[in-house]
């Protein structure tokens, strides 16, 4: 079947799904669909359907919200070529399951499919890390010695793509804050043990 939720509305309500005003019912395709839908409730309120383990929920955004109006910006480390690292990508046929705890799940791990092994070296030490699929990219959830000090305590995200030659570039200058850094409504994945680095990665977004 089609992923997502059903919206029921009268024409007078002015709710639009994928640009079409709803008069009766409309399917709002989830983020797990190749072509996810967008819902427009008003000039400032929009939404989309998030998916998790076969369950769906409507996430709503209001550009007039107090949090957005008072948003002060994002601090980041200066660009550092030191933190552009070339690693090795080894595909795992069929992938493997790795448990990721989430911020609000009270220690319960959710299995994510990790499609390959990423290895790299830093200061003579080899590391093997786990990144799960996120659309067409790989998502690395990591923490380091800056976490809870000069960067966000929960950790940060880095999106990756393997190169055709079997290498993978980890440019930590592109590390970003997770959604839960901006709102308690988000239930972010936490770094598994192998993604908790003992060194400080002074690159990317901080807080």
Where are these regions (language model features)?
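Phosphate/adenylate-binding glycine loop and adjacent helical scaffold
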Residues: 21, 39, 43
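Mid-length scaffold segments of soluble, non-membrane domains
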Residues: 108-151
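Solvent-exposed beta-strand/loop surfaces of large extracellular or lumenal domains
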Residues: 19-29, 142-155
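A short, sequence-level motif marking secondary-structure junctions
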Residues: 23-34, 51-55, 130-138, 156-157
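Extended, aromatic/histidine-rich regions of cofactor-dependent oxidoreductases associated
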Residues: 73-77, 145-150, 156-161, 167-169, ...
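Surface-exposed beta-loop interaction hotspot
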Residues: 43-110
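Forkhead-associated
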Residues: 1-32
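Short, isolated positions in well-ordered beta-strands
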Residues: 22, 46-47, 125-129
């Amino acid at each position: 079947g089609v992923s997502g939720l059903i919206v029921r509305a009268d024409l007078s309500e002015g709710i639009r799904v994928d640009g079409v005003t709803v008069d009766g019912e409309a399917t709002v395709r989830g983020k797990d669909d190749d072509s996810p839908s967008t819902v427009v409730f008003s000039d400032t309120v929009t939404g989309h359907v998030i998916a998790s383990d076969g369950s769906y929920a409507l996430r709503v955004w209001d550009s007039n919200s107090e949090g957005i109006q008072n948003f002060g910006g994002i601090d980041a480390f200066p660009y550092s070529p030191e933190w552009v690292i070339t690693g090795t990508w080894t595909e795992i046929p069929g992938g493997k399951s790795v448990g990721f705890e989430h911020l609000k799940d009270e220690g319960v791990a959710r299995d994510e499919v990790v499609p390959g092994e990423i290895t790299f070296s830093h200061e003579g030490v080899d590391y093997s890390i786990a990144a799960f699929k996120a659309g067409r990219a790989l998502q690395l959830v990591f923490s380091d010695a800056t976490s809870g000090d000069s960067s966000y305590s929960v950790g940060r995200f880095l999106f990756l793509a393997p190169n055709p030659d079997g290498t993978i570039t980890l440019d930590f200058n592109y590390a970003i804050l997770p959604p839960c850094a901006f709102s308690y409504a988000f239930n972010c994945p936490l770094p598994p043990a192998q993604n908790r680095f003992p060194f400080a990665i002074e690159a990317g977004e901080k807080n």
